Structure formats: structure tokens, C-alpha cells
């Protein structure tokens, strides 16, 4: 709660504190009202003293007003859009190529003045232009344009200068809350204080101390001091509450110290008490510091409105009033409108924009359309007075006049020494970097888990991987092992930073917001992030490479080891720079992190392939050789190879002939680079002949890698500074193609700019399409009475018990609406959850909760509707489909499908959703607006036709007054149809409050203060509270607000009365107890008979679910397939990844020859395919999370369908797309490489071609089910991806491609046997290269001379007959060219692959698929399903 107890009284009487000229923070005196840490802290006293001290010290506050004239704003829209799916997305390509845009005017001729120290409230319904107006004033104008003749004057500062050189002096604060979730509230706000801390600080207080204490002041000001050490959190990470997070957002903007502040619906999510406190704080800032502000508010309380100096009313982009706030009501009354009794002034002003709500006075003919209202305004005396005021302002403050120079000098005095005067930032660049580094350190300390996990993971992986090549000896048998080790080291170091893309993508909105506040350059944050990551990268690099280097016995000399570490570290840095660089443009063109990851994934494959190991330089095709030149991994790998081999000689392990005498001139070592007659092989010769590496390139390559690193980071900083993330479009209704209703037309008024949570789409319905229909089924509401007595809810916090609900009593009867109210934290939602039997958290619930005198059975949850505060819906479904889904699964099985569908249409008519029944739900920003979503939330519950009652949690929260009125209209209509409704409310207006029949009021601690009728004009309620209240309810007061003031629950109020005791000793309480006793004893006799009679047709209606499992499965699997089909970005990004990578590999290994190296290349072509598994898995996880969130939060508690159906349908949904992808990958990979030619040579083209496709199919099925296995038990997609990556690294390295089974230590053979990829590699290589002859390349022959008088064949006959191979010329007598392989099956046998096991291995892969499915279902039940008393 805002700390306004003392602020309120001092604001009302206009007095100021007597405390002046004292230490601005009270000298840390615990009893000083200037000390923010004191219990006596007084915000107004502190502000007064701070202003006094500042002015006495010779400093001034920057003050800024704004004058605007003839302000016009416009944007461009495209023709009517439709929902894209996998099939019709191609139809949109012509529209993408041909820009057919239409200009739409958003703001029409706005005029006004907001002087320094003035507050202006901006009123208007959704789509009226409030957001665009505030963005225009603050300079946040992405996505729309300002008319050339628009005039702006900021106290002599031009519009262009303000929004460049003084950008942070006029800020726009949106209603969304974006913060680093792992930072505490204190750290978040202290950072903001530091970013805008002035150069000269009063009383010589040290900078750090000043920022800390100023942060404490603001936290005390907004009532969040108790959250100082609590993490901010977000929707997924536990932290402060939603209301507290909103106040953190407000506090951060306050600390920006901007002279002009534009607040866009920043009170959303706050109750009226906190909204009033927020406005009072703005009033205090304006009064003492001269700050001016413009604030848009929905459901503004009267006491908040009274704090504003000026008001402007907007109506569909037209300004219909601008002037003194206390004269606005009189202006519209003179136009001919009447303000109803107890309607607040802001509600009255906003009602001018709703024809059905404004009341015309008798004898008047007032304006009706927005244009008529605007014309009336421009012809009014008030408008003429405004124009006169504007003319005087222009004369007094000419552009670039004396005032502008004064402001510039004042701003310069605020900036740090060395900062440019034209810079919008307060601190210098290096100060910004240092500040961001401190924040990065705080983020690391607050969340050390990832760093520890990465370090330990690196260490463990190093142990496992290096143990495969433990203690390699300096002989030629270790050549391949050393090359694999160095390749693995390079790959690990290079791609250790790939997940940085996800982290940086997530923080981009935070960085862009704070850059708009002029806290720091985005590049400064990027620079500090790089610097702060250096120690972490060093730690990660050392933890892996230290173990890896010495366990594998690489070149053990100090110089070579430290060179290895240096090269590895720069490889890490260079690749980190690349991933950071490509992240920025990816974010600019991508809506999701999964799409942004695709370029990184494809780049990984390119860099791995052209690192120089899998495809040596002399094997690279000319068309793609350039990739190697641009590849930092390739330069790093060459340097590490040179570091390992150069200047060394390796003892020969295998000779040709094998029985020859070492050192004999007719005997040669059987490796590339050997010289006949030598017993050692030169490392330089080996890498030169095998890889075309030159020892002179060792340090040159490091220089190139460093240069690339500098270039990559430079580009990263540049793009961070100038490239913004992709903005969402404005809200428009999107229909399925061909489903736009014929009797409606979509009028896309306004903007891509009102991209708030409110509509920019207006549905205009034809007269013949409008109906007032309440169907017969809807009229037959529930007959049962739900009642509860002595309900308590107890939990333990830090081992101490705490009671959340304290003996709550009440009932809900058919045909009535009961309001559940109370202060924040009173337990309203908790009570609703307990009554609805949906409380899954820890805690003990006691008390009676009965239906017609009977205990709730397991069918209770599906027989009640629960419209939650969060509007959770599947974004790809239409409104009608959402209702049909609920009706088919939640209504009893014996009811015909046609009847269920007909009832859905009745619900659509009742809720007046016909015009957008076939519109797609979408997401906030692109789809249904807030009101439409709220209607859909209620409609989904009604479609289930709950026979008992409907729970509704905060249906009006965050809505404007007119939308709230419409929602309550809906609830009242349902109530009149016989529905029982229990609804929580946040301090409604008087007119809204009177719509309810009964009230249950809770105080702190969940204690009942009142339960009973409200009465006509709230008379019954008022009469009860006036018995003990200090003051009676004034005639024009809002009874809901007066009631809270009476019990001491409103800001600045206290009460010495124990209202719970008053209630429990009142006659009303006794009557409640008597009625509860009567309901318990006689309720079942009067109400249960009819319900039992109606349900005798279906015994299962009393069961957990309304329909059988098979019916559940059919309906759910259809929706899951539908979701995938209507998410073309998800499907085509998967196809693009599969297609591009497989084609790339196919072309890189185009017509791979049947040489020794060619066989290795074809094996690597198989191994390269596996590089995309991680990305394929991470792509499907967010889709799963979307469905799972909806299921666990809404559908599972409602007993809509079984968890088994959910899991099976999710797993099956990917099969068709992976089946298509398998065909594409097979064709683009199998034929370019030339594997079909091998099958033709062997005469098995049909069988082996078909087997290869089946292997692709089985592999992709394994990938899909492996992803579900990993995400089934994980909380987030990121956690699932990390689990998948760790397991996949093990599966991949033990598949037998890089290291063969006979080279593995015996201990690790079990992992080779357990890896599904080992069976896949075996079958794919069998189908691809078995049963063909091998022809060595020129550099693969071992050349020796036979003894005098012998031919080559005579000399090497035993060698050929024993180990195989062949001679290029059997009859040659010198330069015998011996190839160690003649048949590919010998190559396969060396890696323990048998052609005869190909089909068996294919079957084993399917066993792993079945295992993944079983494990996914089992782990979901173990990790995610509530058990025992928590079962819902």
C-alpha cells in the first residue's frame, strides 16, 4: 500500500512540514521523519526539506512543460488480415512483396498546454488515442508518424532537440512490467537512482550513499520498503506480488527524475486505494520539484481525479476537451449532458464517448459523433481561451530562446564531468559501463546456479569425454584420437556460448526501456555484459580444458599448454561475439526466441562442417571454400593441431608390410605423412599432407581469431545501440480465412500504435444481426444452493503458522450475484480457490462446504464454472472453437453433440459475441481485446453449463469503467437467467456496486466483516456500518469506498473498532447462522431431487470426467493438431532447419568418393545431421508449455479431460510433420552425397533407399519423443532444453561416429550400447556404404619400394591376404602404392558395424521411441500431477 497516511492529510490542508534545511535524510536518526528507514518517515516533510536544501545550495530543479498545437498523428495499415496456417501462408506472399498500405489518421488536431508543475489526466476509452498521445509527447513514436504542421514547444526546446539531446527528460511509462526478475527490488531501484544521479549532490553526501537513501525514500513513498530484499520476479519466477511489481515499475520511472512524465494506464492492477496513493505522489512531485505529468487512467476514483490540474478527453482520436479538470464536468453539462447521481466525474467524462451511456438533458440537441464533439470543442469559449494561452506561451518561450539556453545549462550542471551536452545521458559512457557491471555482478550473485551448473557440467563432461582418450601415447595409433580430441575441444569451446542468445533475447525489452529512460547506452550494457562474462568464461574454459588437456595426454610442455588455453579462450570469445551479434538482427525480425535461434543453429552446422576436421581443406568444394576463410573455428582448430603436432615425432605403431623390420628402407609406416625407412613420423608432415596445415600459421591464426573477435563484438555493440527488437502490431481482429461474418465488417480504426492491451478494432454490426436472446436452456439456471460455514485456511511461513482465512461463512443462491470484497491481501482469491476446490498449494483447509447440505463430490469441480482473473486461452483457436471444446468435454456424455453445439450458439448470442465468434483469440497486442477476452473467459465456463454456480475472479480488474459496466451487465444477465454467481471485486464505483445483491466483506487476515444484502442504493449495507462508523455516509459518496474508510481499510484511515467482533455479535450474524443451519438440514430435500432426476440418464455424470477417455482423446488431439497447423512459423522453421541443414550437408559432401577419407566423410555426414537435434527439441518445447499451462491452470482443475489424454495427444501431434520432414531430409541428403550409387553398385537400391528413409523417420520420431521426455518434468522450456542438451551430449559422443567402440575403454561400452544413436549410425552406414569397393585418394596410399627383384604384389602378398587392402599396380617394381582398404565392409567392421544387423537396429530405435513415450507420461505424473489431498 502507498504510504499516504501523513501525505493525505497534509495534501488536504495544504500545509507543509516545519522541517526545513535539515539533513535531507535525517542524519540517519531513527526517530526523524526525514529518515526513510524510520517508522516516523513523512514523505511530504522529506520532499519539502529536500527542495529547500537544494535551492539553498544554489541548485535548481529542471522544470519542463509542453505546448502542442495542431497535433496530428497517423499510421499505415494493411488490408484485412486473416489467420495464417501451414497451407494459406503462401497466399500472403504477394501482399508481403507488394506494400499495399493505407494511411489511417490516429490523432486529429490536438491542442494544449501542460506547464511545469501541472498534472493532466488523459481520459478516453480503448482505441481513443490515449497511448498514442502520451507516446507523442514523450517522443516514443515507433510505428507511427507526426504531421508536418504539428507544433511542439518544450519551454523553448524544440521537439527534435528534446527527443535526441534530452531524451530522458520526457519519458513514457507503459503499463507492462519488465525487470530483471532475479534482482531484488532494492537492487533494481538503486540502479535507477545511480543512472540519473546529478553531478552536484546537496550537503556533500557521497554519491553511493545518496543513491541508496534516495532509493529508500522512493520505496517508502510507494509502500514497498518491506520488499527491499525480495526478488522482483515475473510470471514464471517467484518474487513480489503483481501489485508490488507494478509499484516497482512506477518507482523506477520516478527515479528517472524526468521533468515531463507520461504514464499510460500505470494503475492497472492496482486497486483504487493504491491508484489514489500513486496520484498523490505525483502531486507531491509536481508541487515541490516542478515536474509535470500526463496520466491516462481507467476507472479513476474521484479523489484521484481531484488531484489533477487539467484534463483532456479523447474520443476515437478526436480531442473533445482540454482544460482545467474542475471545469470539465460543467463544460459537458453545458453541452446538454447530465451526470447521474453518484457517478464520478471521470466516469461521466468517459461516458461521453459511449452513446448508450451518456444521458441527454431535456431540451438539448448535443453532439453525437466524435467529429461533432470535436467541432463543438473548437467552437467553444474554452477552446478560444486555450488558443490565447498557447499564443502567450509561444511568445514567452520561443524556440531556441533564452529559456532553452537556461535549460541546457541546467542540464549540463546535472551531467557528469566529461559528458557531452548533447548527450541525453547523465553519466559518461565508462560510468554507465561500470554501473551496468555492478548490476551484472548482482545478477550473478543473486542467481549463481547457472554458473555453478555450467562449471560443474564442464568439469563432468571433461572427465567423461577425456576418459575416452585417456593418456594417449605419442605414437601413430593416437593420430586419429588426437584429432578427435582437438576437434571436440574446439567444438565445446566454440559453442559453449550458444545459449547466450536465449538470455540476451529475454533481457532485450528491459535494455530498450531503460535506454528510453536515458539510463545508459544499450551498447554500454552489451559492453559491460561482455566484460562481466569474462571471468565466468575463464572459469568455464579452465574447468573443461585443464582436465581435458592433461587426461588425454596432449603435448605436455608449458608453452604448448598455455597456448592451448589461450587459443581455446579466444575461440570462446570469438564465437560468443558471433552469437551476440546475430542475436540483435534476429530479435529485430523474430517474434519468439525459438525463431531467433534458427540462424544460430544453421551457423553452428556451417562452422562445424568447415572447421577442417570433418572436411579437410583439400576436400572442400570450391563453391563453399569461402566459409572456411570466414570461420574462426577453422583458424582455431588449425592452430591447436599445429600446437599439438608441429616439431614432434611420433613413434610408428603399424608398418607396411606388418612383418617388416622397422627402419628397413623397404618398410613404411601405415599413416599419412610417413617416409619409407623411418620409425618415426613427423607431426609437421602428417598435418601438412592430411589437412594442408602449415606450422607457420600457428600465431597468425590466433591473430586472425582475435581480429574476428574484435570485429564481432564491435558489430554486436553497434547493433545493440541502433537495432531495436521487433515491435508487436496493434490489436486487430484476425479471422480464419473465409470465416469473416457476412453481417459484420471490421473497421480498422486507429492504430498500430495503440499496441496496448486494449482494442484498436471496432466491430460494427448490421441492424439485422443484433439480437437480444436468452435461450430456454440459459433461462433454466441452477437450482442448488452452495453454502459454507467456518471456512479456515492455515499455512506455515518459515515454520510459523499463519491463518489466511478465519471462519468465513456464506452462501450463494440461484439467481443472485454475491460480491466478495476486501483490501489487498485479505484472502479474496484464496477463499474463491478454497470454495471452488482448486487450492493446490500447501495448507490446511477446514470448515463445511456443502451443496444442498451434501459434501462436495469428485464431480464438483466440473459442475462449477471458475472464470479466473487471468484470461487464459489457446491463442490459435477461435472464439467459437474455444466454446465448443468446453461444451464437448464438460457436458455429460449422454447429451447429443448437436444439442451441445446449439447451446454454444446460445451462449454466443447471450454474450453478444456473434460479430467475432470466428475471430482468433490471438495474444495481447494481436487478437481479442481485454473486454472480448473477459467475455470469452466467462463464455467458456458457461458453455460447460455448470449446474451449480459460477465463480468469477476480478472480472473488472484493469478494465476501463465502460468495459467494466459491460462485464457486470453480462453477469447480471446470467443471474437473471437463474445462474448463481460469486464474484470478487476491487472497490467498484457506486453505480457498479449497486448491481450486486449480496456482499461478503473480508478484512486483513481473512476475517469476515459483513455478509448480507446490499439493499437498494446500498441502504442495508450503509445502515449496518453507520451503527459503529465515526461518520455517516455522505449522500453522494460511493458506499463501497465509504465502507472501507469506515473499517479503516482505505489509505490514510484507521478504525479503533474491532469490526470482526462487531459482526460476530450482531443480529445479522445470528440470522446468517440460522439460515446456514436450515440449508444444511433441509437443503437436500428441496433441491437435490430435480438434479438427481436430470442426471439418471448417465451414471458417469457423477464421475471425475463428463465424457469417456476416447471422446476426450478425439477432441483434444484435434485441437493440438489445429494448434500446430495454425502456427506456420513453428512448422516452417522446423522444416527450414531440417531442409537447409540436410541440403547443406548433402552439397558439402556432394558425390563423396569411395576413398578412405570419403568413407569417413560419409560417416561424418551422418554425424553432422545430429547437430540439429538440440534445436529441434528446443523448438517444440514452447509449444508444449503453452498447452500445458492452459491445461494445468484452467482445464485440469475444471476436470475437462484426463492428464493421460493430454500427454498422449501432445506426443502424437508432431508425428505428421516429422514424417514429412523425414522425406525432405532423406531426399536432400541421400541423393546429393551419392549414397544411392553405392546401393546401385551393390544391386540393393530399393531396399537400402527405403531403409534409409525409414531410419530418418525413426530418428525424427525419437527426436520428438525425446523432447517430450525432457520437457515432461521440467518447469520451463529453458530447463527442459538444458536437460535435453546434457543428455544429448552423452548420447551423441557415445554413438560410435567420432570414437569407435573398440577404441573406448571397457567401462564406457555400456553407454555406447545405451545410446540410441549408436544403432542409428550403424544402420545408416550399413544402408549407405556397405558392400562396395574402395579406391584410395592419391595422398592415402602408403608408398614403399620392394626389395630388389620383387614386384609390389610379391612383396606385399601376405599383407594383402592378412589385413586386406590392394596395390595400385601389382606388377610395379618400385614406388609400391598400397591402399589399406579395398572393401567398405572392412571399414565398417573396424567400427564394429555389421551389415546384417541393419534391420534389427532399426527395430531397436523404435524401442527407444516407446521408452521415451513411456518415460514422458510417467515423469509427468510423478513431477506435475498433484497427489493425495492436493489432487485437482
From Swiss-Prot:
Binding positions for ATP per the UniProt entry: 822-829
Main location: membrane
InterPro entries on file: AAA+_ATPase, ABC2_TM, ABC_trans_N, ABC_transporter-like_ATP-bd, ABC_transporter-like_CS, ABCG_PDR_1, ABCG_PDR_2, P-loop_NTPase
Keywords (A to Z) from UniProt: ATP-binding, Cell membrane, Glycoprotein, Membrane, Nucleotide-binding, Repeat, Transmembrane, Transmembrane helix, Transport
Short name of one Pfam family: PDR_CDR
GO molecular function (one): ATP binding
Membrane topology of the entry: Multi-pass membrane protein
SUPFAM superfamilies: P-loop containing nucleoside triphosphate hydrolases (SSF52540)
Biotechnology: Xenovulene A is a natural product exhibiting little structural resemblance with classical benzodiazepines yet is able to displace high-affinity ligand binding to the benzodiazepine site of the gamma-aminobutyrate A (GABAA) receptor and could be potentially used as an anti-depressant with reduced addictive properties.
Disulfide feature: none
Induction remark: Expression is significantly up-regulated under xenovulene A producing condition.
Glycosylation sites per record: 265, 1017, 1371
Domain of life, source organism: Eukaryota
Protein family per UniProt: Belongs to the ABC transporter superfamily. ABCG family. PDR (TC 3.A.1.205) subfamily.
Full protein name: ABC transporter asL7
Amino acid at each position: 500500500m502507498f504510504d499516504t497516511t501523513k501525505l493525505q492529510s497534509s495534501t488536504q490542508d495544504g500545509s507543509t512540514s516545519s522541517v526545513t534545511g535539515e539533513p535531507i535524510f535525517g542524519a540517519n536518526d531513527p526517530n526523524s521523519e526525514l529518515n526513510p528507514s524510520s517508522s516516523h518517515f513523512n514523505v511530504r516533510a522529506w520532499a519539502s526539506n529536500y527542495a529547500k536544501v537544494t535551492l539553498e545550495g544554489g541548485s535548481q530543479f529542471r522544470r519542463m512543460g509542453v505546448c502542442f498545437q495542431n497535433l496530428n498523428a497517423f499510421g499505415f495499415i494493411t488490408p484485412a488480415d486473416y489467420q495464417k496456417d501451414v497451407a494459406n501462408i503462401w497466399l500472403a506472399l504477394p501482399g508481403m512483396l507488394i506494400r499495399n498500405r493505407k494511411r489511417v489518421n490516429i490523432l486529429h488536431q490536438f491542442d494544449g498546454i501542460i506547464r511545469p508543475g501541472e498534472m493532466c489526466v488523459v481520459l478516453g476509452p480503448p482505441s481513443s488515442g490515449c497511448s498514442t498521445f502520451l507516446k507523442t509527447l514523450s517522443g516514443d513514436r515507433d510505428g507511427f508518424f507526426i504531421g508536418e504542421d504539428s507544433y511542439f514547444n518544450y519551454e523553448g526546446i524544440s521537439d527534435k532537440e528534446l527527443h535526441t539531446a534530452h531524451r530522458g527528460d520526457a519519458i513514457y511509462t507503459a503499463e507492462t512490467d519488465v525487470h530483471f526478475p532475479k534482482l531484488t527490488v532494492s537492487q533494481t531501484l538503486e540502479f535507477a537512482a545511480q543512472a540519473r544521479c546529478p553531478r552536484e549532490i546537496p550537503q556533500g553526501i557521497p554519491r553511493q550513499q545518496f543513491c541508496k537513501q534516495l532509493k529508500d525514500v522512493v520505496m517508502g513513498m510507494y509502500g514497498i520498503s518491506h520488499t527491499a530484499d525480495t526478488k522482483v520476479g515475473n510470471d514464471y519466477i517467484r518474487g513480489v506480488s503483481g501489485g508490488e511489481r507494478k509499484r516497482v515499475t512506477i518507482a523506477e520511472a520516478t527515479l528517472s527524475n524526468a521533468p515531463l512524465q507520461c504514464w499510460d494506464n500505470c494503475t492497472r492492477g492496482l486497486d483504487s486505494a493504491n491508484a489514489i496513493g500513486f496520484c498523490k505522489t505525483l502531486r507531491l512531485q509536481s508541487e515541490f520539484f516542478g515536474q509535470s505529468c500526463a496520466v491516462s487512467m481507467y476507472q479513476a476514483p474521484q479523489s484521484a481525479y481531484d488531484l489533477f490540474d487539467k484534463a483532456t478527453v479523447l474520443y476515437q482520436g478526436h480531442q473533445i476537451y482540454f482544460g482545467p479538470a474542475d471545469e470539465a464536468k460543467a463544460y459537458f453539462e453545458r453541452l446538454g449532458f447530465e451526470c447521474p447521481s453518484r457517478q464520478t466525474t471521470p466516469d461521466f467524462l468517459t461516458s461521453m464517448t459511449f452513446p448508450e451511456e451518456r444521458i441527454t438533458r431535456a431540451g438539448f440537441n448535443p453532439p453525437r459523433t466524435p467529429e461533432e464533439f470535436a467541432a463543438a470543442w473548437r467552437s467553444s469559449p474554452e477552446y478560444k481561451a486555450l488558443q490565447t494561452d498557447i499564443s502567450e506561451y509561444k511568445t514567452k518561450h520561443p524556440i531556441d530562446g533564452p529559456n532553452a539556453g537556461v535549460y541546457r545549462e541546467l542540464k549540463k550542471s546535472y551531467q557528469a564531468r566529461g559528458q557531452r551536452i548533447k548527450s541525453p545521458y547523465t553519466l559518461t559512457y565508462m560510468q554507465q559501463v561500470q554501473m551496468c557491471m555492478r548490476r551484472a555482478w548482482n545478477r550473478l550473485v543473486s542467481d549463481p546456479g547457472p554458473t555453478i551448473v555450467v562449471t560443474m557440467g564442464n568439469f563432468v563432461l571433461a572427465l567423461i569425454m577425456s576418459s575416452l582418450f585417456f593418456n594417449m601415447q605419442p605414437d601413430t595409433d593416437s593420430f586419429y584420437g588426437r584429432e578427435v580430441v582437438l576437434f571436440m575441444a574446439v567444438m565445446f569451446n566454440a559453442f559453449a556460448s550458444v545459449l547466450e542468445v536465449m538470455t540476451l533475447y529475454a533481457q532485450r525489452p528491459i535494455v530498450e526501456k531503460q535506454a528510453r529512460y536515458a539510463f545508459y547506452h544499450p551498447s554500454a550494457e552489451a559492453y559491460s555484459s561482455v566484460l562481466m562474462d569474462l571471468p565466468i568464461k575463464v572459469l568455464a574454459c579452465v574447468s573443461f580444458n585443464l582436465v581435458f588437456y592433461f587426461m588425454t595426454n596432449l603435448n605436455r610442455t608449458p608453452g604448448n599448454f598455455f597456448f592451448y588455453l589461450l587459443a581455446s579462450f579466444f575461440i570462446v570469445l570469438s564465437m560468443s561475439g558471433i552469437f551476440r551479434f546475430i542475436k540483435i538482427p534476429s530479435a529485430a525480425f523474430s517474434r519468439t526466441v525459438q525463431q531467433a535461434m534458427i540462424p544460430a543453429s544453421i551457423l553452428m552446422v556451417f562452422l562445424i562442417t568447415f572447421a577442417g576436421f570433418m572436411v579437410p581443406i583439400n576436400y572442400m568444394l570450391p563453391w563453399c571454400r569461402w566459409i572456411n576463410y570466414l570461420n574462426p573455428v577453422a583458424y582455431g582448430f588449425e592452430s591447436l593441431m599445429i600446437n599439438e603436432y608441429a616439431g614432434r615425432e611420433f613413434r610408428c605403431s603399424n608398418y607396411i608390410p606388418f612383418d617388416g623390420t622397422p627402419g628397413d628402407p623397404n618398410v613404411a609406416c601405415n599413416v599419412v605423412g610417413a617416409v619409407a625407412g623411418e620409425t618415426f613420423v613427423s607431426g609437421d608432415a602428417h598435418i601438412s599432407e592430411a589437412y594442408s596445415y602449415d606450422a607457420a600459421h600457428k600465431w597468425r591464426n590466433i591473430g586472425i581469431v582475435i581480429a574476428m573477435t574484435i570485429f564481432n563484438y564491435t558489430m554486436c555493440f553497434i547493433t545493440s545501440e541502433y537495432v531495436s527488437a521487433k515491435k508487436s502490431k496493434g490489436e486487430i481482429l484476425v479471422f480464419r480465412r473465409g470465416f469473416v461474418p457476412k453481417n459484420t465488417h471490421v473497421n480498422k480504426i486507429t492504430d498500430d500504435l495503440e499496441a496496448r492491451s486494449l482494442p484498436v478494432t471496432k466491430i460494427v454490426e448490421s441492424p439485422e444481426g443484433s439480437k437480444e436472446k436468452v435461450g430456454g436452456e440459459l433461462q433454466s439456471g441452477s437450482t442448488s444452493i452452495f453454502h459454507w460455514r467456518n471456512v479456515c485456511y492455515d499455512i506455515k511461513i518459515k515454520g510459523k503458522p499463519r491463518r489466511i482465512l478465519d471462519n468465513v461463512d456464506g452462501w450463494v443462491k440461484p439467481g443472485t450475484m454475491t460480491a466478495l470484497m476486501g483490501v489487498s491481501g485479505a484472502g479474496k482469491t484464496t477463499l474463491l480457490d478454497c470454495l471452488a476446490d482448486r487450492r493446490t498449494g500447501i495448507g490446511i483447509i477446514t470448515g463445511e462446504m456443502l451443496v444442498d447440505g451434501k459434501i462436495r463430490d469428485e464431480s464438483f469441480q466440473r459442475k462449477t464454472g471458475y472464470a479466473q482473473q487471468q484470461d487464459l486461452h489457446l491463442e490459435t483457436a477461435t472464439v467459437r472453437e474455444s466454446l465448443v471444446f468446453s461444451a464437448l468435454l464438460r457436458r455429460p456424455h449422454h447429451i447429443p453433440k448437436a444439442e451441445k453445439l446449439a447451446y454454444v450458439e446460445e451462449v454466443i448470442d447471450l454474450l453478444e459475441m456473434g460479430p467475432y465468434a470466428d475471430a482468433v483469440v490471438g495474444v495481447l497486442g494481436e487478437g481479442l481485446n481485454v473486454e472480448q477476452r473477459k467475455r470469452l473467459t466467462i463464455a467458456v465456463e458457461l458453455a460447460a453449463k455448470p449446474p451449480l454456480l459460477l465463480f468469477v475472479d476480478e472480472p473488472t480488474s484493469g478494465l476501463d469503467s465502460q468495459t467494466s459496466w459491460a462485464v457486470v451487465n453480462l453477469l447480471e444477465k446470467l443471474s437473471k437467467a437463474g445462474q448463481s454467481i460469486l464474484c470478487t471485486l476491487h472497490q467498484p464505483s457506486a453505480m457498479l456496486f449497486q448491481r450486486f445483491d449480496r456482499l461478503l466483506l473480508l478484512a486483513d487476515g481473512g476475517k469476515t466483516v459483513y455478509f448480507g444484502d446490499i439493499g437498494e442504493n446500498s441502504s442495508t449495507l450503509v445502515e449496518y456500518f453507520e451503527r459503529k462508523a465515526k461518520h455517516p455516509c455522505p449522500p453522494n459518496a460511493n458506499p463501497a469506498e465509504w465502507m472501507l474508510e469506515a473499517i479503516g481499510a482505505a489509505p490514510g484511515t484507521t478504525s479503533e473498532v474491532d469490526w470482526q467482533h462487531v459482526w460476530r455479535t450482531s443480529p445479522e450474524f445470528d440470522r446468517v447462522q440460522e439460515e446456514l443451519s436450515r440449508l444444511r438440514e433441509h437443503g437436500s430435500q428441496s433441491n437435490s431431487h430435480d438434479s438427481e432426476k436430470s442426471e439418471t440418464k448417465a451414471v458417469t455424470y457423477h464421475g471425475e470426467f463428463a465424457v469417456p477417455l476416447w471422446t476426450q482423446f478425439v477432441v483434444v488431439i484435434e485441437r493440438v493438431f489445429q494448434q500446430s497447423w495454425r502456427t506456420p512459423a513453428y512448422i516452417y522453421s522446423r522444416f527450414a532447419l531440417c531442409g537447409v541443414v540436410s541440403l547443406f550437408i548433402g552439397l558439402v559432401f556432394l558425390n563423396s568418393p569411395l576413398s578412405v577419407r570419403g568413407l569417413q566423410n560419409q560417416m561424418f555426414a551422418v554425424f553432422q545431421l545430429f547437430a540439429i537435434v538440440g534445436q529441434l527439441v528446443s523448438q517444440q518445447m514452447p509449444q508444449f508449455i503453452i498447452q500445458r499451462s492452459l491445461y494445468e491452470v484452467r482445464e485440469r482443475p475444471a476436470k475437462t479431460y484426463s492428464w493421460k489424454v493430454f500427454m498422449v495427444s501432445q506426443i502424437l501431434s508432431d508425428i505428421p510433420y516429422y514424417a514429412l520432414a523425414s522425406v525432405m531430409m532423406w531426399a536432400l541428403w541421400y541423393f546429393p552425397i551419392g549414397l544411392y550409387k553405392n546401393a546401385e553398385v551393390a544391386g540393393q537400391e530399393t531396399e537400402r533407399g527405403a531403409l534409409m528413409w525409414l531410419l530418418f523417420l525413426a530418428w525424427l520420431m525419437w527426436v520428438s519423443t525425446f523432447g517430450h521426455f525432457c520437457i515432461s518434468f521440467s518447469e520451463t522450456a529453458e530447463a527442459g532444453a538444458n536437460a535435453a542438451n546434457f543428455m544429448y551430449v552423452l548420447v551423441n559422443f557415445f554413438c560410435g561416429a567420432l570414437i569407435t567402440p573398440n577404441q573406448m575403454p571397457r567401462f564406457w561400452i555400456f553407454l555406447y550400447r545405451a545410446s540410441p544413436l549408436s544403432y542409428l549410425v550403424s544402420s545408416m552406414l550399413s544402408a549407405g556404404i556397405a558392400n562396395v569397393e574402395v579406391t584410395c585418394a592419391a595422398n592415402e596410399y602408403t608408398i614403399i619400394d620392394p626389395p630388389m627383384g620383387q614386384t609390389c604384389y610379391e612383396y606385399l602378398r601376405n599383407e594383402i591376404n592378412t589385413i586386406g587392402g590392394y596395390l595400385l599396380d601389382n606388377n610395379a617394381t618400385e614406388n609400391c602404392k598400397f591402399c589399406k582398404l579395398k572393401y567398405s565392409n572392412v571399414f565398417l567392421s573396424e567400427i564394429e558395424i555389421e551389415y546384417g544387423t541393419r534391420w534389427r537396429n532399426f527395430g531397436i530405435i523404435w524401442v527407444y521411441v516407446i521408452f521415451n513415450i513411456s518415460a514422458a507420461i510417467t515423469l509427468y505424473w510423478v513431477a506435475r500431477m498433484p497427489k493425495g489431498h492436493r489432487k485437482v
